[in-house]
């Protein structure tokens, strides 16, 4: 056995430890010696002798068969192998150890499997080895079970073949055939692996190659993308939907993309892990960011305005294809001249026309009808006197009107700059031909579903009004012709098909199909297209227009001819012909076109009114106060005037009062008769049933008409004949009535216009202003303090003279025919004295002539403001006719002759002296050198009549102080006209005492204290 004749151990034998080999040697001692000898003899003959090998193999085979028939375990072969492994040298002992490990494992595995037939371990070991796998590893006891499972797996996969399936007689030939099969299997595996690699490369090239990219781009342009490109997996980066402000999506995507580029440039090789940023037009208020982690998105979006980072949503994987699926955009391509609407600002919702588009398609220049107030509502700072412009808001925005350079020049010249006759710059905005040209961002403009109205289209016409509203109305009518609707119960006629000419009743209807019950087919209703039906009406039916220019109009059907229905309009009283399908039956006979109807008085501006002579849905024909007939839109009407509550009146050529509802007749011309509809300034609107033109409405000046019947008498079916005879009116006195007097009536021009007024109602109470306009009972007042216009009831104002004076009410102003009280030039303290007696017994009588002016001078009286005379009972009536500067005497006959106050300058006449040189207005002037109560004597020195008495005893008394008239030794009683010192004498009691306390200029003045 030492000659190396032992069969070499296969490469797949495992190496076992010494403990297992010792156990194997113990098992080998129990084997039969015959087997060991036979095996050892075969080993000594050498491997080179084929005959010996064949004989040994045959002997072994016979022994194995004999042992298998007896049922004894085959352990002799194992013992022989153990002996041979011990005698081997040069590393053969390790190979035998590996064989023992393999035998141990197999035996241990076989002991567990009792159902399997036991075979010689050496032969089974040789046949179950894989010659093409080099499996050599050191294993431990813990990995024995895993090796057993791997071996069984190799057996199942065909890498190890069982010897029991082959004929045992083949021997080495069977092993060679097995080697050939294994080599062929390896070749097949190599070939299949190469084919798999080529096939995989082809698939990758088709999927990610350049040709596939071209196909993908072509498919994307066609709107179709294969589904395999849209299927993500859980390994792909997550996409988060982040909430943002609606309308800011595209702007935020550009902003975030720019931020990413800046961060990548600053960080160098460390790129930010943001893979993509996008938004979808179908999902407003969200942007989508693709990133591997949520924290990356939070840090990336931190500090960016208009992003609500706390409100983010993870998009599920199954919804990603729908999110990334391309859809056809519904955006309208903007072109010059197309109509759009503004989304924000004071022009929100206004129609605009595209004038220019920027090169980057991000901004657009629009042509808009401006909304300006020209600084009417600006406030002025009371300290700096600077104008504070108020920015108009959407709630208080002005009406759309073309730019008026005259108004801007008059009200806000500082902000106006003229470039040429057509181009102006006002508040840094350009106005050309009256239109505003302003740039807007594309996201602030609405481009879809723009349906301009007739009113809006009319504003974009030329300044001369070249827009043909009739043509626009006809185009709208044609567009609405397709909007035909049928209601259940409508009687219709079939126009096309086999049932042409049949008539039936609509059972139900949709936008395109109508179900009709025909008498010829009572069992089953038939369906017809809407275009094949026509409505049926009869004369006398009351119909209403549901589509077209006359939408909302109603009336009675007169005739029907070839599908055209003619009816009498309830609004215009004219015949209207319209297609039958644009009508529907109506039980309401009142016109319902809009809030305006025939003969309504409407306000077009602050000073212009008109009467509607033809009413439509959006277009009206009116006649203004000048008699001009024009066509306007509904938006041009500011408001409707309620004539039933109007108190406006005027007078005819005879001075008779005319009010709304009265009947008048023209004095000259066609002598047209009619009823007054409205009174405006110097014109009146009259409607006549005898005139067909302009719906019977005409405008006439009240000077050219006569009133023939008042409204009140018309209600009582009586004519007011008294107003037709001026002689009777002149003989008739003023009407007597116990009732309170009626409110004053207006005559001629409005008396309140241009008057200075003070507000008496709350809100602006006490503020001064000027009446700029009057419309009915309302007056437009321009306040002085705020440069602001307000509208207020004209009877809640107090009217003043421009120079001051007392205020009066509106009714007093009307009674005075617009004349205001004269303004005071200054305060007056003159009180006319009573007539004084000439003797000691003369008593200054009390004044009972209060109506004549008595004590207080009559400021602003109707007689020109003259000082009234003093009416005395005790001294005659010599002072009754005295005037302020006239020739009447001051004191009559007994007080000093015929001295005048200022008639002859006071040169020669004295107050009470006898030739004295001190006159009232002579050398000693009233206010020249002498003071008011100073050393100036009342008369010449030495006279008894108050010779030494001064006004204030030398003191400068005030107007209402406690100064006495004189300061004599008798107790202070002034002796104006007598020598008696008694207080009870008639001349001693001063008449100033009784009435002096009532003076308006000094309060409790004691001019005449006893």
UniProtKB/Swiss-Prot annotation:
CDD domains: KOW_Spt5_1, KOW_Spt5_2, KOW_Spt5_3, KOW_Spt5_4, KOW_Spt5_5, NGN_Euk. It comes from Candida glabrata (strain ATCC 2001 / BCRC 20586 / JCM 3761 / NBRC 0622 / NRRL Y-65 / CBS 138) (Yeast). Pfam families: KOW1_SPT5, KOW4_SPT5, KOW5_SPT5, KOWx_SPT5, Spt5-NGN, Spt5_N. Residues 90-119, 135-152 have a biased composition (Acidic residues). Residues 9-26, 55-70, 120-134 have a biased composition (Basic and acidic residues). Belongs to the SPT5 family. Residues 1-155, 160-179, 895-1010 are annotated as: Disordered. This is Transcription elongation factor SPT5. One of its GO terms (cellular component) is rDNA heterochromatin. It is found in: Nucleus. It comes from the Eukaryota. InterPro entries: KOW (IPR005824), KOW_Spt5_1 (IPR041973), KOW_Spt5_2 (IPR041975), KOW_Spt5_3 (IPR041976), KOW_Spt5_4 (IPR041977), KOW_Spt5_5 (IPR041978), NGN-domain (IPR005100), NGN-like_dom (IPR006645). Residues 28-44, 960-973 have a biased composition (Polar residues). Gene3D superfamilies: 2.30.30.30, NusG, N-terminal domain. Component of the SPT4-SPT5 complex. Interacts with RNA polymerase II. The SPT4-SPT5 complex mediates both activation and inhibition of transcription elongation, and plays a role in pre-mRNA processing. This complex seems to be important for the stability of the RNA polymerase II elongation machinery on the chromatin template but not for the inherent ability of this machinery to translocate down the gene. Residues 333-360, 536-563, 750-777 form the KOW domain. Its main location: nucleus. PANTHER family: SUPPRESSOR OF TY 5, TRANSCRIPTION ELONGATION FACTOR SPT5. Residues 907-943, 977-988 have a biased composition (Low complexity). Keywords: mRNA processing, Nucleus, Repeat, Transcription. Residues 895-906, 1001-1010 have a biased composition (Gly residues). GO terms for molecular function: chromatin-protein adaptor activity; DNA binding; histone binding; mRNA binding; RNA polymerase I core binding; RNA polymerase I general transcription initiation factor binding; RNA polymerase II complex binding; rRNA binding. SUPFAM superfamilies: Translation proteins SH3-like domain.
């Amino acid at each position: 056995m030492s000659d190396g004749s032992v069969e070499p151990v296969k490469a797949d034998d495992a190496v076992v430890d010494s403990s297992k080999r010792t156990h194997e040697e113990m098992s080998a001692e129990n084997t039969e010696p015959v087997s060991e000898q036979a095996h050892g003899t075969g080993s000594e003959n050498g491997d080179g002798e084929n005959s010996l090998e064949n004989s040994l193999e045959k002997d072994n085979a016979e022994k194995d068969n004999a042992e298998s028939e007896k049922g004894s375990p085959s352990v002799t072969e194992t013992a022989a192998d153990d002996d041979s492994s011990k005698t081997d040298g040069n590393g053969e002992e390790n190979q035998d150890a590996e064989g023992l490990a393999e035998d141990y494992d197999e035996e241990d595995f076989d002991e567990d499997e009792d159902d399997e037939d036991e075979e010689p371990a050496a032969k089974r070991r040789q046949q179950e080895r894989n010659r093409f796998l080099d499996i050599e590893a050191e294993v431990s006891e813990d990995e024995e079970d895993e090796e057993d499972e791997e071996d069984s797996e190799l057996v199942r996969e065909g890498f190890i073949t069982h010897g029991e399936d082959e004929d045992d007689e083949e021997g080495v030939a069977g092993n060679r055939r097995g080697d050939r099969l294994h080599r062929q299997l390896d070749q097949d595996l190599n070939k299949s692996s190469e084919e798999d690699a080529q096939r995989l490369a082809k698939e990758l090239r088709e999927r990610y190659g350049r040709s596939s990219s071209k196909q993908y781009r072509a498919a994307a342009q066609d709107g179709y993308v294969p589904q395999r490109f849209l299927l993500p997996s859980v390994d792909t980066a997550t996409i988060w939907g982040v909430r943002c402000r609606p309308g800011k999506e595209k702007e935020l995507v550009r902003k975030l993309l720019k931020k990413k580029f800046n961060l990548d440039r600053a960080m160098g090789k460390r790129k930010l892990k943001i893979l993509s940023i996008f938004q979808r037009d179908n999902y407003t208020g969200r942007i989508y960011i693709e990133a591997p982690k949520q924290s990356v998105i939070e840090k990336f979006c931190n500090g960016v305005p208009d992003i609500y980072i706390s409100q983010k949503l993870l998009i599920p994987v199954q919804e990603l294809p729908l999110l990334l699926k391309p859809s056809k955009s519904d955006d309208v391509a903007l072109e010059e001249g197309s109509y759009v609407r503004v989304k924000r600002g004071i022009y929100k919702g206004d129609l605009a026309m595209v004038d220019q588009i920027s090169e980057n398609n991000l901004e657009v220049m629009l042509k808009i009808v401006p909304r300006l107030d020209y600084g009417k509502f600006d406030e002025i700072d009371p300290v700096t006197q600077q104008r504070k412009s108020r920015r108009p808001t959407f709630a208080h925005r002005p009406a759309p009107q073309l730019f008026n350079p005259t108004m801007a020049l008059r009200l806000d010249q500082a902000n106006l700059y003229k470039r040429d006759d057509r181009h102006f710059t006002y508040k840094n905005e350009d106005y050309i031909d009256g239109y505003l040209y302003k740039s807007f961002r594309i996201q602030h403009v609405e481009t879809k579903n723009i349906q301009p109205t007739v009113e809006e289209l009319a504003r974009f016409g030329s300044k001369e009004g070249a827009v043909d509203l009739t043509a626009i109305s006809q185009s709208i009518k044609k567009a609405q012709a397709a909007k035909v609707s049928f209601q259940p119960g409508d009687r219709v006629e079939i126009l096309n098909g086999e049932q042409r000419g049949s008539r039936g009743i609509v059972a139900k209807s949709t936008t395109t199909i109508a179900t009709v019950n025909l008498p010829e087919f009572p069992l089953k209703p038939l369906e017809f297209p809407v275009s094949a039906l026509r409505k049926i009406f009869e004369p006398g039916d009351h119909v209403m227009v549901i589509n077209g220019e006359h939408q909302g109009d109603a009336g009675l059907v007169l005739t029907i001819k070839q599908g055209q229905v003619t009816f009498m309009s309830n609004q215009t009283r004219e015949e209207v012909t319209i297609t039958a399908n644009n009508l529907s039956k109506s039980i309401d006979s009142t016109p319902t076109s809009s809030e305006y109807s025939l003969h309504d008085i409407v306000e077009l501006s602050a000073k212009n009114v008109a009467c509607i002579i033809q009413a439509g849905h959006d277009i009206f024909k009116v006649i203004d106060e000048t008699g001009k007939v024009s066509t306007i839109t509904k938006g041009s009407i500011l408001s409707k005037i309620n004539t039933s509550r109007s108190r406006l009146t005027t007078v005819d050529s005879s001075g008779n009062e005319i009010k709304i509802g009265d009947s008048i007749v023209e004095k000259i011309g066609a002598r047209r008769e009619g009823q007054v509809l409205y009174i405006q300034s110097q014109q009146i609107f009259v409607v006549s049933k005898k005139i067909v033109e302009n719906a019977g409405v005409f405008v006439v000046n009240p000077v050219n008409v006569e009133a023939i019947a008042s409204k009140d008498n018309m209600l009582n079916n009586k004519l007011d004949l008294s107003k037709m005879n001026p002689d009777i009116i002149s003989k008739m006195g003023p009407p007597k009535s116990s009732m309170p007097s009626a409110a004053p009536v207006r005559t001629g021009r409005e008396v309140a216009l241009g008057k200075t007024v003070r507000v008496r109602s709350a809100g602006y109470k006490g503020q001064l202003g000027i009446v700029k306009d009057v419309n009915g009972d309302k007056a437009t007042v321009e306040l002085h303090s705020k440069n602001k216009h307000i509208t207020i009831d004209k009877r809640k104002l107090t009217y003043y003279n421009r120079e001051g004076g007392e205020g009066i009410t509106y009714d007093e102003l009307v009674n005075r025919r617009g004349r205001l009280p004269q303004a005071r030039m200054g305060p007056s303290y003159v009180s006319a004295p009573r007539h004084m007696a000439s003797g000691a017994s003369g008593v200054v009588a009390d004044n009972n002539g209060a109506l004549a002016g008595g004590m207080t001078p009559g400021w602003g009286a109707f007689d020109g403001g003259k000082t009234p005379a003093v009416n005395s009972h005790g001294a005659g009536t010599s002072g009754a006719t005295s005037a302020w500067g006239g020739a009447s005497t001051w004191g009559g006959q007994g007080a000093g002759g015929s001295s005048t106050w200022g008639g002859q300058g006071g040169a020669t006449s004295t107050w009470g002296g006898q030739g004295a040189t001190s006159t009232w207005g002579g050398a000693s002037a009233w206010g020249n050198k002498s003071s008011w109560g100073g050393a100036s004597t009342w008369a010449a020195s030495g006279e008894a009549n108050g010779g030494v008495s001064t006004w204030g005893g030398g003191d400068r008394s005030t107007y209402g102080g406690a100064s006495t008239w004189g300061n004599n030794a008798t107790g202070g009683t002034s002796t104006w006209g007598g020598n008696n010192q008694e207080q009870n004498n008639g001349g001693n009691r001063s008449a100033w005492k009784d009435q002096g306390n009532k003076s308006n200029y000094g309060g409790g003045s004691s001019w005449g204290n006893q």
